[in-house]
């Protein structure tokens, strides 16, 4: 037996939840489908936990100005890596809980915690249930991919899905890819005492187009950790 709906939304991340809000203005015949981790990429493993660790790093980095401001004892301050990660994870959990409490937690039968696959253009198999929808919105997002040649290194390879699950900070870290995410995490971890090396095959960092700005950015970031 098939369930008939006007709209099926695959993916309960930021895009999928936004789609729900738009669909609800037009119809109450819809389902939201997601069999993976809930709470949005931004709140779980993206911009929110990254900003938490960036703030910790900025707070610690600022100790270098204390003597100038008449504050003594900066040289005796130190980072407790386990406490840093516990703090970041506590904030991350708060962010995720707030997302869930205002989205999927309030849904009834409209939310289905299963994976979907297409049987026909308008027919989905969701778990062991068939759902036919007049319209299907695909909002599955993306996830990091580890090249097959690198997989032999096992848990030495970290992605943005892994790094905020660490119980402590690594002693050293190579950041491969110096886009916005690589730069902000590389700088933050370097400021917290991790020996960071940045690696990118491009001649510019942060996708900066202006040659003069790109050159200055490389000089400034290069003072914090080496760039290859």
Question: Residue locations for each model-derived region?
Answer:
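Rossmann-like NAD(P)H-binding beta-loop-alpha module
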Residues: 167-209
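Glycine-rich flavin
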Residues: 2-5, 21-28, 33-169, 202-206, ...
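Conserved N-terminal Rossmann-fold NAD(P)-binding element of oxidoreductases
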Residues: 10-11, 33, 138, 176-177
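A structural signal for isolated positions on well-ordered beta-strands in alpha/beta enzyme cores
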Residues: 8, 31, 174, 197-198, ...
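N-terminal Rossmann-like FAD-binding beta1-loop-alpha1 element of flavoenzymes
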Residues: 4-32, 182-191
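Conserved acidic residues
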Residues: 13, 115-117, 179
